[in-house]
């Protein structure tokens, strides 16, 4: 147990555990040098001593945490540690404790409780004994932070020996939503019936003097109720009853007093110890990561959750649930009130000289941002619901501001007309989103002396809310003539302020963000020199710190986009370029500069050499050495002479006054235009080409598509342009075109839904969303959906906006078409709504709007409507079904229990009851850890330079830093686990690779979602590593799960699934499941042909593998045919001398000879009336071992003439005998294969198109 725990609590345990299996001696050495050692902790109760593995760099509080988490020391929460009789400070590093070394003994000393410690102890004990139910809050939704990994591993363990996970798998079947739902679990053992606060709280004043802190009541499994006093000395049973108050100690036969509540309950309940052990055993079956609490990240909220009727979602009575807020934050809630701004800025001012300083500072920063993001998101939800009183109630709704929990909130709308010329509310909404991105970039730069407010943007119920920490002095009324802002534009661009104190810090910021120093002019025509955009403001806080605000214009406007004529005007003028593009353009220009510089030097050298050619031979040898050196210097170019910075205020209404200024401004504009052109002429075509050639992983859904575009510096507004480029590339990029169009529709729907939702009263939100979804996705089931609205509730909201009721499928489609035209300058095809992929679109929309839907079989198609009487699937059956729905209203109740009450109404694809919850979507400005990233980069470089030992040490150091700074559950840590597992796999340390890949899967599931594209990739990696470690059956289970997820998020035939199917086929061959293996190769071939064409090298490679699979499956006729096809493609594409062509030729000869010998053998057997074929094991068994990776370069080529039919007839005749002579079962199998596999694959191809 201690080890498993350490793995979570102490990052350094992980490497120790990972390398332990492979290099015991090395590890021992490394442990000592790396500062890992073991100490003994002396305890006041059983087991009286424990050993803990610690690191000299960690703090004493980390050791405390280890003790609290260990099963043998669960009961301790209120204690301190002593060494040599001296108390140790919790916040010092172990290396600073005098004389502490390996095998030292420290003592755990129980402390007296105070009220806060007592409350925390009760919360902790409730969690430990399984008495705490789910906390219901407005940030974490249903099943937040879910992981399915354990359930899938368990399924493998339960499966029979002979079966493998893919034995009856149908690649073309429709997706099953059960894939992403938590599996039903056996109820956990119950240790106590209840632990709650007693009605006698709070403690009267006279008893507080005597050390009373809380009164509790505990009901044991035996049904006895005990009233307990929480006292400074511990816990004891008192004489209270429900009617009489007497909190003095009660004398009972058992021991009625203990320092820990856990120990006391064990004394009072005879069954407690056994049930508590059973509970721990049950918990230990799960991977610790799946139950570990979130500390530095917000858990992912799944879009699909079990319905309220399921046991997984059942609501249980628990009186303490409503008392938990008091237990966690005290009577007046003051413990959770923090001065966020002061915390942010003092953390920034912490020292950063040594590595230890930086670790401490970054760790604190990460925790602070996580706490702030969570608190700000909770407050934003309350603001959106109208539960917080505004500071300016007389203003219009959009102009109102709020303060809650020391966080300042405002709406992302143009309440006061600041953005009137830029596009009003639309511009304001975009500006606050860009502001968070800008603040995140500045936080990442970490400039000394420049401060940013804590900032979060929350989208909830159609409203965008900005939460910021309160900058001291921001509300201060200035003297007449003084500006509210100290640097930059004041209330627009009419007045411009400058301040000498801001120049140096803004200069550093602008240099790093590639922003050019430039002049701007106020309304009087007065010139001001600014380091940044006129929109970027500097404020001198009353705390003396320099704050930067409004960072939404750190990059220039996309001039070309604004000038391009669309059929309708773009909604706003905030279409700026992305920071990633500016960075990419800077690198592009720098490489041009370096090349030019090298060329210039070479030509200069050539001239100098020509001049020197006549010099005497005596000096030649001396010169040779200096020449080599100068060549090296020549290749090293000093880039200090290169600079590229862009003016963000170009084309934004600035009016230069003099000719010189106008010339400079024209030059700035030219540079910005070149950047815009670089995006259009280089970045976008390159991305399309990379996807066409298969050089980069293919996006699977809207999220992964957006990430890919943003990484390349492409704005989402270019979806339409990319869709056009993709179409021009032809059918190979059909999958991309489908995704791009789906993303445009989803985003257009989101804008429309937000418009409707903004002023809908809270009880009608589900009705509004379900009605709009029915208009988009359910028009086939019900062409005239009617919104379900409770008329009695409606009358309570006379001012509510119910305009969504008027939406119809036709009006919604027209609105979507208009939004797509305006926002993406793309025209949807005429019947676009008939080719929607309903489930994938529903998932995308749910994620974009924060919906959590109750799982059921959603019906988007008339043919899916369940029939009440035997009816065909044709038109008559549907008509009859509809007729019955209309006439027999009451009779329908019994047939569909999921919607028993709703059957009276016309059938709908989505009903309001399907929308169980709506969660806020949070955009934050948390910076990444630069220290952890530096260590990882240094490790990578060392490995590239073949310094394996140093490289691995640095990488493990980076892992340790990641876990220390971010905590275990964080997307950045998941990413690192993923990268490290690949590194270990490449260095052939398979066990370590599997261990890290497993962690990557669980952390990705819990932070990014059980069906995110990253989760699929993590499962596919894990399956490869499990197979390499010899656990092929487990590997196949992971592949099956990944394929099931793929069907939900993308559908069938994703371009990257070719590789996965091939891997599955090779794994099945490894298990000698030749028949199944062949089916997976055939499926892979089907997808490959549809994407790359019949004559591509990709197709030939798969044909080559399929031929081998057919030979192993005793179908030599098929094998010869496929190998001939492969040979012909290689021959026409690569020529006769290529290695692939020659290999295919050799195989073809062997397989043809084989086919002949089998046919002869079959004839003999038939003559003797034997019913089996004895295949030649030597030629077919041992030689056919297709290696993964027998692939040629990907080239699409011309179609070769049909030379494949060369010898087909003779082979046909020969192989007629095999069919007659083979066992009946084989014949049936072949028929089944011919009938079943191919048509289904064709069908799936059609449906995906």
Curated annotation (Swiss-Prot):
GO terms for molecular function: mRNA binding. TPR repeats lie at residues 974-1007, 1016-1049, 1058-1091. Residues 605-628 have a biased composition (Basic and acidic residues). One of its GO terms (cellular component) is cytoplasm. One of its GO terms (biological process) is mitochondrion organization. Residues 1-32, 605-636, 868-903, 1174-1249 are annotated as: Disordered. Residues 1176-1190 have a biased composition (Polar residues). The keyword Cytoplasm applies. It is found in: Cytoplasm. Pfam families: CLU, CLU_N, eIF3_p135, TPR_10, TPR_12. Residues 318-562 form the Clu domain. Keywords: Cytoplasm, Repeat, TPR repeat. Its main location: cytoplasm. May associate with the eukaryotic translation initiation factor 3 (eIF-3) complex. Belongs to the CLU family. mRNA-binding protein involved in proper cytoplasmic distribution of mitochondria. This is Clustered mitochondria protein homolog. It comes from Aspergillus niger (strain ATCC MYA-4892 / CBS 513.88 / FGSC A1513). The gene is clu1.
């Amino acid at each position: 147990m201690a080890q498993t725990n350490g793995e979570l609590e102490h990052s350094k345990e992980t490497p120790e555990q990972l390398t332990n299996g492979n290099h015991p001696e090395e590890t021992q050495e490394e442990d000592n040098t790396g500062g890992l050692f073991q100490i003994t902790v002396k305890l006041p109760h059983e087991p009286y001593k424990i050993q803990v593995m610690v690191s000299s760099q960690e703090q004493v509080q980390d050791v405390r945490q280890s003790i609290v988490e260990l099963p043998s020391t669960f009961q301790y929460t209120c204690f301190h540690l002593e060494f040599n009789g001296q108390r140790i400070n919790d916040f010092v590093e172990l290396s600073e404790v005098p004389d502490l070394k390996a095998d030292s003994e420290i003592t755990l000393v129980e402390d007296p409780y105070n009220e806060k410690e007592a409350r925390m102890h009760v919360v902790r004990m409730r969690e430990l004994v399984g008495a705490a139910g789910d906390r219901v809050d407005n940030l974490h939704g249903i099943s937040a932070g879910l992981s399915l990994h354990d359930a899938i591993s368990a399924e493998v363990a339960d499966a029979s020996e002979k079966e493998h996970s893919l034995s009856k798998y149908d690649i073309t079947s429709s997706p099953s939503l059960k894939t992403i739902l938590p599996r039903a679990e056996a109820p956990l053992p119950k240790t106590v019936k209840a632990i709650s606060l007693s009605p006698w709280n709070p403690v009267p004043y006279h008893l507080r003097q005597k050390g009373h802190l809380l009164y509790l009541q505990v009901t044991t499994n035996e049904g006895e109720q005990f009233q307990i006093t929480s006292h400074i000395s511990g816990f004891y049973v008192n004489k209270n009853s429900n009617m009489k108050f007497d909190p003095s100690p009660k004398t009972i036969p058992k021991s009625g007093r203990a320092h820990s509540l856990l120990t006391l309950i064990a004394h009072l309940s005879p069954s407690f110890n056994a049930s508590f052990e059973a509970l721990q055993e049950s918990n230990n079956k799960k991977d610790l990561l799946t139950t570990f609490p979130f500390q530095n990240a917000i858990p992912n909220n799944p879009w699909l959750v079990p319905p309220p009727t399921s046991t997984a979602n059942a609501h249980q009575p628990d009186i303490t649930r409503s008392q938990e807020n008091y237990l966690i934050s005290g009577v007046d809630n003051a413990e959770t009130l923090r001065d966020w701004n002061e915390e942010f800025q003092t953390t920034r001012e912490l020292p950063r000289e040594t590595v230890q300083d930086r670790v401490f500072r970054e760790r604190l920063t990460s925790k602070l941002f996580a706490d702030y993001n969570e608190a700000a998101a909770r407050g934003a939800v309350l603001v959106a619901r109208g539960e917080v009183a505004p500071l300016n109630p007389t203003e219009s709704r959009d102009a109102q501001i709020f303060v809650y929990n020391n966080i300042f909130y405002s709406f992302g709308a143009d309440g006061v007309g600041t953005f009137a010329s830029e596009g009003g509310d639309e511009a304001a909404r975009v500006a606050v989103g860009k502001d968070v991105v800008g603040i995140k970039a500045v936080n990442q730069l970490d400039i000394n002396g420049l401060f940013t407010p804590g900032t979060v943007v929350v989208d909830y119920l159609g409203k965008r809310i900005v939460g910021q920490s309160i900058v001291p002095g921001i509300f201060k009324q200035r003297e007449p003539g003084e500006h509210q802002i100290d640097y930059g534009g004041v209330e627009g661009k009419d007045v411009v302020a400058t301040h000498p104190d801001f120049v140096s810090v803004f200069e550093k910021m602008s240099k790093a963000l590639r922003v050019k120093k430039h002049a701007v002019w106020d309304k009087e025509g007065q010139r001001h020199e600014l380091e940044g955009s006129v929109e970027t403001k500097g404020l001198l806080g009353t705390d003396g710190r320099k704050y930067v605000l409004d960072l939404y214009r750190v990059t220039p406007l996309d001039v070309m986009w604004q000038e391009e004529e669309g059929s309708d005007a773009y909604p706003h003028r905030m279409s700026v370029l992305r920071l990633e593009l500016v960075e990419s353009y800077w690198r592009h220009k720098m490489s041009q500069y370096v090349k030019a510089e090298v060329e210039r030097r070479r030509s200069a050298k050539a001239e100098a050499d020509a001049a020197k050619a006549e010099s005497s031979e005596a000096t030649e040898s001396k010169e040779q050495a200096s020449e080599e050196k100068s060549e090296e210097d020549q290749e090293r170019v000093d880039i200090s002479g290169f600079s590229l910075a862009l003016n963000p205020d170009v084309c934004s209404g600035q009016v230069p006054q003099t000719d010189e200024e106008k010339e400079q401004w024209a030059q700035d504009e030219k540079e910005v235009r070149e950047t815009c052109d670089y995006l259009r002429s280089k970045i976008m075509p390159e991305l399309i080409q990379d996807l066409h050639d298969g050089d980069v992983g293919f996006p699977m859904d809207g999220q992964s598509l957006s990430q890919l575009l943003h990484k390349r510096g492409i704005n989402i507004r270019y979806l339409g342009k990319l869709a056009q480029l993709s179409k021009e590339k032809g059918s190979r990029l059909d999958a991309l075109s489908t995704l791009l169009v789906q993303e445009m529709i989803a985003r257009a729907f989101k804008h429309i839904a937000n418009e409707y939702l903004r002023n809908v009263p809270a009880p009608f939100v589900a009705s509004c969303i379900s009605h709009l979804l029915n208009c988009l996705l359910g028009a086939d089931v019900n062409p005239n959906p009617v919104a379900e609205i409770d008329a009695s509730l409606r009358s309570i909201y006379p001012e509510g906006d119910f305009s969504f009721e008027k939406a119809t499928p036709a009006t919604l489609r027209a609105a979507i078409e208009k939004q797509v035209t305006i926002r993406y300058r793309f025209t949807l095809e005429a019947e676009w709504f008939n080719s929607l992929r309903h489930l994938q679109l529903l998932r995308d929309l749910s994620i974009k709007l924060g919906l959590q839907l109750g799982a059921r079989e959603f019906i988007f198609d008339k043919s899916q409507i369940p029939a009440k009487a035997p009816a065909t699937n044709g038109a008559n059956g549907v008509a009859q079904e509809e007729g019955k729905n209309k006439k027999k209203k009451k009779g329908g109740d019994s047939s569909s229990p999921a919607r028993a009450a709703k059957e009276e109404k016309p059938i709908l694809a989505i009903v309001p009851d399907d929308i169980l919850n709506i969660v806020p979507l949070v955009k934050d400005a948390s910076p990444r850890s630069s220290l952890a990233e530096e260590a990882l980069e240094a490790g990578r470089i060392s490995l590239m330079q073949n310094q394996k030992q140093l490289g691995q040490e640095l990488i493990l150091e980076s892992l340790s830093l990641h876990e220390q700074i971010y905590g275990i559950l964080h997307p950045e840590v998941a990413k690192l686990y993923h990268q490290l597992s690949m590194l270990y796999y490449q260095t052939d340390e398979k066990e370590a690779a599997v261990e890290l890949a497993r962690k990557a899967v669980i952390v990705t599931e819990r932070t990014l979602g059980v069906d995110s594209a990253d989760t699929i990739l993590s499962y596919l990696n894990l399956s490869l590593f499990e197979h390499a470690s010899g656990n092929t059956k487990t590997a196949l289970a992971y592949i099956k799960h990944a394929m099931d997820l793929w069907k939900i998020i993308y559908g069938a035939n994703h371009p990257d699934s070719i590789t996965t199917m091939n891997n599955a086929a090779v794994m099945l061959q490894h298990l000698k499941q030749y028949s199944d293996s062949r089916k997976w190769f055939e499926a892979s071939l089907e997808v490959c042909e549809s994407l790359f064409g019949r004559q591509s090298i990709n197709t030939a490679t798969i044909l080559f593998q399929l031929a081998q699979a057919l030979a192993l499956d005793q179908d030599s006729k098929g094998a010869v045919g496929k190998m001939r096809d492969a040979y012909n493609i290689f021959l026409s594409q690569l020529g006769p001398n290529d290695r692939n062509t020659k290999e295919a030729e050799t195989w073809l000869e062997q397989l043809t000879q084989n086919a002949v010998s089998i046919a002869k053998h079959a004839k003999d057997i038939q003559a003797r009336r034997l019913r089996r074929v004895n295949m030649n094991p030597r030629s077919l068994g041992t030689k056919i071992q297709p290696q993964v990776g027998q692939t040629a370069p990907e080239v699409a080529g011309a179609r070769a003439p049909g030379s494949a039919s060369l010898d087909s007839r003779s082979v046909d005749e020969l192989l007629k005998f095999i069919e007659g002579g083979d066992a009946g079962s084989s014949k049936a199998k072949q028929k089944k294969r011919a009938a079943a596999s191919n048509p289904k694959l064709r069908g799936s191809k059609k449906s995906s198109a």
